[in-house]
């Protein structure tokens, strides 16, 4: 049975209005249905009892202190672009939107950092850094995601192969705890071995441990030269086999992505975004950044020679911003294109060792096809994060789709584990992957997860039923 959370009353609604403002609070049927779910309604549609837009940490603190006292569950929501059913009110209660907390503070040039509130958009932080001649590298596909959401999911993206994940760029965090207290995790320093590294525990915790109110991010000098290569191959298998060849070169790529021609056709057909390379049944897209043209030219030459020596039909250099933009626009349009081309979608977001990518891709296509599902693997092959996109055709009934996707997921996750991989590389556990987590983690690790949750949130009020589930 569910944990006995309090059903909210008019007195509770009035209190939340008193510490925020009446025009920033909605209750019951007043709440827009878009706040019942994230980008994957398949992972749960749950109406909040109250939706509030907060402006500062003091409002969050007051609400959390009250919710803690009254035993009311609270979920924090950013831009709602998650893909795991994470920012949803599974047990009702309060949904707090931090999207009005979107201030980006001036760059700290001496420390090469930038500080922002959680509702600031990733695209705006990247623009602010660029305006100062600096660079914020984490680059997940959804540029309109909030930075708070990026931090609590440890977002990665296409440039992780060279620059790492969001975690690698977080210097310090300010957050409100479940009891309403306000804490700082670390400070704007490069090194810190002062006690347990709680900051890195908070990063990637999916909003289950605390609510971010401010984050300070490391910046890098902006690269002065960049180039995108497109390597077409006769088959997806040949394309995947090329990945370790690229990684063996003495130049670290900024991004390595693969796309099948069928997926490119979906984007072209539905979004009218044209891919500039027409050859090949699959393509490998490789990007390099460099601080000098000489360094960049050396990297491009080495990659092109390796591609042609390993079966590529060509190695096309997207030498202008327009051609490079066309390549990455198609890559960025995959999710939107698939939504337009199918009745429904399901995704397996596994990560496998880079040396096993080709093996995973070959087996994944067979698994999904055996269950009658159209499947389109793609992803960040530079870090082994493969998005296995499953698309529902109009001929499948709801029950057939549900059974086929579940059976496919069971086998795909088992395949990932067999290859030494993990359940999720980017999107997290949320509500959508709960049933598969214990198989990966094991009972001892699940017990550790629960102990960590209780250490932060002893009343289990913050985003309950995500990552781990006490209410079974």
Residue ranges and their predicted role:
Residues 27-37, 221, 227, 232-411, ...:
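C-terminal substrate-recognition/cap domain of FAD-linked oxidoreductases
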Residues 181, 434-472:
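Activity-critical C-terminal alpha-helical subdomain
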